[in-house]
Amino acid sequence: KMEGNSPEKEIDGSGVLPEDGAFDGSGEWVKLLTSDTENNKFESHVDGMSAEEVAIFTREAADKVGATKMDRPEDVEVSPVTDKVYVALTNNKYRGATGENAKKNQEDPTEYAPVKENKNGLVMEIEDDHAGEKFTWNLLLVCGDPKEANTYFGGFDKEKVSPISCPDNLAFDSH
């Protein structure tokens, strides 16, 4: 479950940075399933779902426990240098949608997904003890055309950034 650390009124769906200058916050890992593979035992932590159901229908299990809905996570990678986790969130054209698409709307824009009808995606950075119960996060990229106000490129000058859309896979080089 994730929360932003900026006042809700500063997140209006336009993608404009909040006053603190970053899309960031904290979160709490929610346990869905535990396993003891040596003894071939698995335990569900989701009421009304077996361990097998949690393993197969993970998104539904996460919804049942109130986990944060994300904008189509496509890849998760750990930096071999910093141990930070990076998540490519491809897009979600229905976030904050109105009219005919409102019924498909996952939820309104939030600090972890600050753009209405997010057509270009995001890249999130997660740090702290990944075996722990809590974490901190920030949006490294709010993708799109750098000429648009609703983009953010980790603090880099937008004039020096090419358009980025729908991040899919992440990789690290030796640098």
Briefly describe each language-model feature range:
Residues 1-175:
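Sequence/structural signature of beta-propeller domains
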